[in-house]
């Protein structure tokens, strides 16, 4: 990174377009209509809490609404223009300004880049949130609105949340806040009470696949795009991360090892661990660990009697049933929780990632073999 390069953005996924640059939003027509109706009523609430799983379009909707408000300014102007959705043409000056991050009436808050440490700060700091004081204290330019977008509120600490609460409690005229939250239950209840909650839902696999199809950064064939869409569980952001991290190949390798439990092919395990844990392969690490966690979650659901999920590898469903029956549901829940704690600790302490992967599979091997061991001792 050169000194002249812009600072990285924590709310941008890899080389993919930032939500403010994204013109199309699929699968969220109900949420879009709710915002449109609120604005056209002339009684637009000043703060909106956009909730739902990560990567489903919450920030994209926030920027889409911000462009609409800044373009039209009032319900009367929007009605006169015949607006029936929140779309702003890409060649419109407002779209271009917002996409460039240069519109004076939008303030975007995210985890800041630490130039000295050359990494993102771990929290959305109180100093970042306090920027709202000066921003909303200035008179707005064209359109009369000032809009703050927080992506994501999950990154705030208590001090940041209290700073946000102050501005939410005394909102200036013609101010709008869009607060993106993946797990809103973790926010201060007083913040939630000041906002109108808009719950957004995961997308259909076909919608996720359509976004992948339209992306210039996704080179996968149609079958693989659909597989990534299904693995993403309705999250475009997740599907793009799977693509970037070589997720389909990783998933096949992971499942091949899991299907052999309680026996492990040590050679293949080390090959997988090297692939996930190699230096500089952050995408592969994040994607591989996430996919393994998802597989274990589906295993627990299977053990609890949930309907079988579609399989992505031949024989996967039968192996999942077999493993679910190889130990009690409590044991699988316990190991799932322990693995989550192990990964979190490894991230915090910068532990050798290969050792983490080997330990994870050792734990799984132990649980999968426990039932057989009990029979032998009996």
What are these language model-derived features?
Residues 116-126, 153, 197:
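Flexible beta-alpha connector loops of hexameric P-loop NTPases
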Residues 1-68, 72-80, 84-87, 93-97, ...:
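Charged, glycine-rich active-site and insertion segments that engage polyanionic ligands
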Residues 142-147, 172-178:
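Loop/turn-to-beta-strand initiation segments
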Residues 126, 158-159, 189:
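Conserved D-loop-proximal element of ABC-family nucleotide-binding domains
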Residues 51, 150-151:
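Residues at the beta-strand->loop junction immediately N-terminal to the Walker
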Residues 152-156, 168, 184:
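Conserved Walker B
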Residues 137, 162-176:
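Conserved catalytic/switch belt of AAA+ P-loop NTPases
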Residues 34-39, 92, 123-147, 155, ...:
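Conserved alpha-helical scaffold flanking the Walker A/P-loop in AAA+ ATPase domains
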